[in-house]
Amino acid sequence: MQDFETFLADHLPRAETFHPHYNDALASMLVGGGKRFRPRLLLGIVEAYEPLLVESAMHAALALELFHTYSLIHDDLPAMDDADLRRGHPTLHTRYGDALAILAGDALNTHAFEILAESPLRSDVRIELVRILARNGGTGGMVLGQAIDLHFEKRPLKLEQVIELHRNKTAKLIAASLEMGAVIVGLERESRKALYDFGIELGLLFQVQDDILDATQSPEEAGKPTGHDGDKNSFVTLLGLEGARAYADGLAESLEERFGSFDAPIREALEGLMRDYLFRHRD
């Protein structure tokens, strides 16, 4: 992913301004680490089928990272999770205040779509990428999931409701990453759907694993506050730690089976990523 890190560093959002902190606020969380999970999924699909398009696809990968970073900045705010640590660093609002953190998140959100619109891809592809990101990140996707999560804090949900919450809040943007890669390389609609559905299940596993890590890791190990999910509708809160681990095992085994049915180029491109993440809850 070194190529993506270089691309990111070369395309950090900036404005010509006399504001003393604005550009630092835009850039700090982007360069402050992170797994780059969503860009890696998208670029993995492109690398598998159309390696010559990888450079052009960097714009879409960056758009995903910008959008994801905006969501983290807002998620950390006092009105939401009220977190003071992210990726081992103080959260944006603790450094620059709530107002600038909100505005920085807003700027990264909108800049993601500017990056997509200006990418060196065909116009029909750009339009479809914008649609996928907006649909999965917005009204009926990530934003909806966050709204459900906040509204039902301290009010227990049923398992199917918790799944629906996290399908929206976490899984849809991960699924969108795979679908966007499929669109860039021109895969048929059936293959796009298979990758999207795989991404939904992968996103749910990712969330269960995060819930497990919240219950078992220290803030220093996780790089963010832990042990704060007791009032939230997490999988550990609902199923208990061992129940959540068993649920994660089931998802991981299902994903392994699905992954084996993909074409060889996809398996080869994403095998390392799957190996790193499918069973990380067992570490």
Tell me what each language-model feature is.
Residues 12, 16-278:
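Mg2+-dependent prenyl diphosphate-binding active-site environment of isoprenoid biosynthetic enzymes
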Residues 280-283:
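Charged C-terminal helix
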